[in-house]
């Protein structure tokens, strides 16, 4: 049924500050995707827009991710509409399965979910007006941003490998001596658990986005009834981490211990490119670090650890959920730490930076919602200072850190703990327990 809303009301809706913000964000995101598409094609590879468009017809890279994106979009739908959407997606996928089986093509599900998301976008534009159109477009936007984020990340990784031939692994590995070389230690532990432990950690590592959607669905469970989104939720943090993180890769390119000190992974890297095949059996020697040349295929995606950052965000946002969600958030964080270190994808220094990175972004988003009051500005500034200090220390003080592990090891951990403490203290002021005193945001100057 068409919504019957006065055109003046529609105009008023589009002039609301939050609608303007969402529209601006959409335009910026589109421009960003176009820029990445151009950059990827410059290096002879399809970009995020092309790869996503292919999945309308061809077998998608990740079916679970597409269905998770559809689930995220469906938070704006009624239960009847959700059942229709799920049925349509499954029906479309069955048709694709049958056709692929006939032509002996790659079998993968997920096209149906993408078709449903795109159909909802068409319905929003052609069959909805006013607030209902905005709400449905927000849902579609969140779903598409999740799948586009995966494609965007792939393009970013390609760009880092092509534009940053020199990597700084020797500096991070040297600094990691102050932390006791945790990647080497956890790597030996994971190997001792055998194939079972490795398969569990690998599944957790790969399905991180699906776990994020599960936590986000709980946060957004009232959207359909209230016809509005909450001010802050996990998806916002997840997307901002993915947007800002690759920029740090360009500044501090690192490939990881399995590549710099091992045989490589994911079909990239090799022993002849590494300093030696010593991970995880022998910690790297204490020699003066220097930038090292690496291939043009391996992503420079270690500093900071975005998997740790995303898992930390899931942990934070699961704290207000039911017990099973809190337990799941804790498990996902611990398992992600085990995978990132145990598979040799990251150094301990990356993990510390990833935690600080997440808390700073989370604080910034919360502070933005509250009007940038003093406590929020202080928290964001402190987190940014600590994060910057960590990266500078890894680059220019790595030898001193390795020579004095009894001093710098505790200092690194203390810097991370201090950000955690300030974040927790600030959140307690902003989100008091029921019955406690409520701190109101500081008054802001009126807009004239």
PLM features per residue range, with description:
Residues 36-49, 95-106, 127, 389-403, ...:
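Juxtamembrane "helix-exit" motif on the non-cytosolic side of transmembrane helices
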Residues 381-441:
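Transmembrane helical bundles and short interhelical boundary loops of multi-pass, membrane-embedded
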Residues 110-206:
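Intramembrane catalytic core of multi-pass membrane enzymes that act on lipidic substrates
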Residues 51-68, 107-121, 142, 201-206, ...:
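Alpha-helical transmembrane segments of polytopic membrane proteins
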Residues 180, 250-323:
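Membrane-interfacial catalytic/cofactor-binding modules of polytopic membrane enzymes
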Residues 15-28, 75-92, 134-140, 230-238, ...:
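Membrane-interfacial loop-to-transmembrane alpha-helix junctions, especially the N-terminal start
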Residues 138-144, 216-267, 329-330:
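Interfacial segments of alpha-helical transmembrane regions
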């Amino acid at each position: 049924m068409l919504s019957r809303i006065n055109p003046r009301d529609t105009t008023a809706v589009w002039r609301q500050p939050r609608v303007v913000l969402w529209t601006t964000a959409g335009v910026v995101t589109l421009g960003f995707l176009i820029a990445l598409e151009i950059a990827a094609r410059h290096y002879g590879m399809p970009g995020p827009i092309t790869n996503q468009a292919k999945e309308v017809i061809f077998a998608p890279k990740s079916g679970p991710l597409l269905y998770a994106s559809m689930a995220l979009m469906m938070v704006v739908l009624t239960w009847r509409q959700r059942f229709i959407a799920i049925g349509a997606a499954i029906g479309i996928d069955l048709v694709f399965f049958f056709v692929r089986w006939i032509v002996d093509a790659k079998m993968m599900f997920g096209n149906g979910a993408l078709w449903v998301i795109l159909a909802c976008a068409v319905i929003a534009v052609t069959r909805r007006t006013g607030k209902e159109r905005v709400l449905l477009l927000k849902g579609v936007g969140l779903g598409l941003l999740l799948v586009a984020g995966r494609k965007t990340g792939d393009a970013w990784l390609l760009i880092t490998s092509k534009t940053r031939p020199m990597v700084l692994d020797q500096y991070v590995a040297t600094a990691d001596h102050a932390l006791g070389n945790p990647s080497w230690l956890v790597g030996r532990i994971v190997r001792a658990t055998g194939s079972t432990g490795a398969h569990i950690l690998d599944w957790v590592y790969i399905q991180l986005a699906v776990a994020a959607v599960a936590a986000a669905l709980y946060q957004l469970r009232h959207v359909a009834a209230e016809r509005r989104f909450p001010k802050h939720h996990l998806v916002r943090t997840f997307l901002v981490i993915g947007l800002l993180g690759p920029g740090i890769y360009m500044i501090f390119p690192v490939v990881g211990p399995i590549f710099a000190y091992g045989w490589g992974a994911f079909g990239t890297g090799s022993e002849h490119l590494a300093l030696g095949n010593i991970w995880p059996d022998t910690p790297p020697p204490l020699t003066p670090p220097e930038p090292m040349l690496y291939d043009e295929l391996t992503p420079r995606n270690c500093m900071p650890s975005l998997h740790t950052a995303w898992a930390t965000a899931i942990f934070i946002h699961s704290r207000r959920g039911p017990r099973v969600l809190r337990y799941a958030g804790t498990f996902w964080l611990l398992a992600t730490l085990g995978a990132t270190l145990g598979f040799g994808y990251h150094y301990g220094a990356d993990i510390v930076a990833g935690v600080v990175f997440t808390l700073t972004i989370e604080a910034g988003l919360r502070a933005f919602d509250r009007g940038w009051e003093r406590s929020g500005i202080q928290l964001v500034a402190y987190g940014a200072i600590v994060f910057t200090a960590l990266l500078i220390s890894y680059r220019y003080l790595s030898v001193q850190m390795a020579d004095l592990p009894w001093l710098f090891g505790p200092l690194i951990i203390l810097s991370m703990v201090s950000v955690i403490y300030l974040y927790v203290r600030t959140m307690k002021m902003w989100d008091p327990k029921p019955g406690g005193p409520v701190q109101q945001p500081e008054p802001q100057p009126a807009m004239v």
